[in-house]
């Protein structure tokens, strides 16, 4: 993993890396508290569709986790997102995703073609996440055998569920804003294999993930320690207090 850029933001070091995985360059970013001892906790954050590794919500929580708790956060650009595409491609993707989020008539439905595209993106992203995690664990800012958690909603869940199911080092996970659709047998199997603590956040009026699919995904998780938080509103209207719930969840399970 090659360091490409570094800056300090109010006591938090933000390091950009380039990681070669199976012939692709994966842009990564790691946040850690400046001058702190090696972190005992590492959070992996997966962004949503049309977003990127430094999207506002991820960056804000990564900075807060570093400042207040001394935790390290890792994020990567998913295939077809962030620094892996041009600005024009990113703008087109944002318009398409925005139309689906708003439930605009004529927005591309989640049909068989989109499901295949998502499965292919997840297939590519899983080894990338594993390689990024391996490389981050070797950094001086991360302690020996840290407690590792995952956070990812929407596309961060679509990729995160199969990733977490295949990654025994992760001790707990926050998912949400996604569902289990008919015919998604592999996704259902991955959810069933997740037996670590899970917190699942969902919006009751989500135009992207119908409520029956969200409930089906929550039910599919194999964990006996799982909680579903349902709030009114659309896909991008998660209440701010859920961020406090995520922090409390990590404190409870990662120490």
Q: What positions do the PLM features span?
A:
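Short beta-strand/loop motif that positions the catalytic acidic residue
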Residues: 194, 200-202, 206
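C-terminal catalytic histidine-bearing segment of alpha/beta-hydrolase fold enzymes
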Residues: 216, 223-255
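N-terminal cap/lid segment of alpha/beta-hydrolase-fold proteins
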Residues: 1-38
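Short alpha-helix in the alpha/beta-hydrolase fold that links the catalytic acid
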Residues: 58-59, 163, 186-187, 196, ...
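Serine-hydrolase catalytic machinery in alpha/beta-hydrolase-like enzymes
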Residues: 48-141, 187
């Amino acid at each position: 993993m090659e360091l490409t850029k570094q800056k300090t933001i109010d006591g938090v070091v933000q390091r950009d890396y380039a990681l070669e995985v199976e012939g692709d360059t994966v842009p990564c970013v790691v946040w850690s508290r400046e001058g702190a001892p090696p972190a005992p906790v590492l959070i992996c954050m997966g962004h949503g569709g049309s977003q990127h590794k430094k999207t506002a919500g991820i960056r804000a929580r990564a900075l807060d986790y570093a400042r207040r708790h001394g935790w390290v956060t890792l994020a990567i650009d998913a295939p077809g997102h962030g620094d892996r595409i041009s600005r024009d491609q990113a703008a087109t993707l944002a318009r398409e995703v925005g139309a689906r989020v708003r439930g605009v008539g004529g927005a591309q439905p989640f049909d068989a073609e989109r499901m295949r595209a998502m499965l292919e993106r997840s297939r590519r992203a899983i080894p990338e996440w594993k390689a990024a995690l391996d490389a981050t664990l070797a950094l001086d800012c991360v302690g020996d055998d840290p407690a590792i958690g995952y956070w990812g909603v929407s596309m961060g869940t679509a990729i995160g569920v199969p990733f977490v199911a295949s990654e025994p080092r992760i001790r707990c996970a926050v998912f949400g804003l996604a569902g289990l659709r008919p015919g998604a047998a592999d996704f259902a199997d991955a959810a069933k294999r997740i037996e670590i603590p899970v917190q699942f956040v969902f919006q009751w009026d989500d135009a992207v993930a119908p409520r029956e699919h969200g409930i089906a995904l929550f039910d599919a998780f194999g964990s006996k320690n799982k909680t579903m938080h349902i709030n009114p509103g659309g896909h991008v209207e998660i209440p701010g207090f859920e961020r406090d719930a995520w922090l409390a969840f990590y404190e409870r399970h990662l120490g």
